[in-house]
UniProtKB/Swiss-Prot annotation:
Primary role: Necessary for normal cell division and for the maintenance of normal septation.
Residues involved in GTP binding: 35-42, 62-66, 80-83, 147-150, 180-182
Entry-linked Pfam families: MMR_HSR1
GO molecular function: GTP binding; metal ion binding
The keyword RNA-binding appears for this protein: no
Protein name: Probable GTP-binding protein EngB
Disulfide bonds: none
Taxonomy of the source species: Bacteria, Pseudomonadati, Pseudomonadota, Gammaproteobacteria, Enterobacterales
Residues in the signal sequence: none
Domain of life: Bacteria
Family note: Belongs to the TRAFAC class TrmE-Era-EngA-EngB-Septin-like GTPase superfamily. EngB GTPase family.
């Protein structure tokens, strides 16, 4: 079976939900994007899809703390998880957001990959490591994007990339680390390739149905 390259430029918004219980049916394939509030997550989604306003940014913590679903095509979805790490948000709200993130990452069966975005100058903060740990515990592969890579000179960028690649080895998971920059389009091809790989992993339960109808 040949692999399909998806056209992320046609991605469109579907719905928002406060937690996993308000999401659409747990079917198809989803890849989630997670990151601290200032990691450049919205910019990465907008760059990937070539749509400036697809993932809206908010200057006010709490305004965008929903799980946002975008559809590439039927059954193929990108999921924008709530940004984490707002310093000025009350502890109770932080715990609520983290609970919603944890439930999604560990209970959503159609989740096939997690993209964690981190500022290349400040990678692997506590909550970043928690995201990775949650994913590894349930066998979900992870792509770590070190954002704002254009802020560092080439040598410093490579040094940070190598440092993070070594630092994630103890997680014992399927973790790929790449440099990324939305303005300079660094790493966009690597992101697209990884998404195509994950989205081409057809859920086993779909295969018999396709085979049965192939000869009709």
């Amino acid at each position: 079976m040949t692999s399909k390259n998806y056209n992320y430029h046609v991605t469109h918004f579907v719905t928002s939900a406060p937690d996993i219980r308000h999401l659409p049916g747990d079917e198809g394939i989803e890849v989630a994007f997670a990151g601290r509030s200032n990691a450049g997550k919205s910019s990465a989604l907008n760059t990937l899809t070539n749509q400036k306003g697809l993932a809206r940014t908010s200057k006010t913590p709490g305004r965008t703390q929903l799980i946002n679903l975008f559809e590439v095509e039927e059954g193929i979805r990108l999921v924008d998880l709530p940004g984490y790490g707002y310093a000025e948000v009350p502890e109770e709200m932080k715990r609520k957001w983290q609970r919603a993130l944890g439930e999604y990452l560990q209970m959503r069966n159609c989740l096939k990959g997690l993209v964690v975005l981190m500022d290349i100058r400040h990678p692997l903060k506590d909550l970043d490591q928690q995201m990775i740990q949650w994913a590894v515990e349930v066998g979900t592969p992870v792509l770590l994007l070190l954002t704002k890579a254009d802020k560092l000179a080439s040598g410093a960028r490579k040094a940070q990339l190598n440092m993070v690649r070594e630092a994630v080895v103890p997680f014992m998971g399927d973790i790929q680390v790449e440099a990324f920059s939305s303005p300079k389009k660094i790493g966009v091809d690597k992101l697209s390739q990884k998404l195509n790989t994950w989205f081409n992993e057809i859920p086993p339960e779909v295969l018999p149905e396709d085979d049965d109808t192939a000869g009709e």
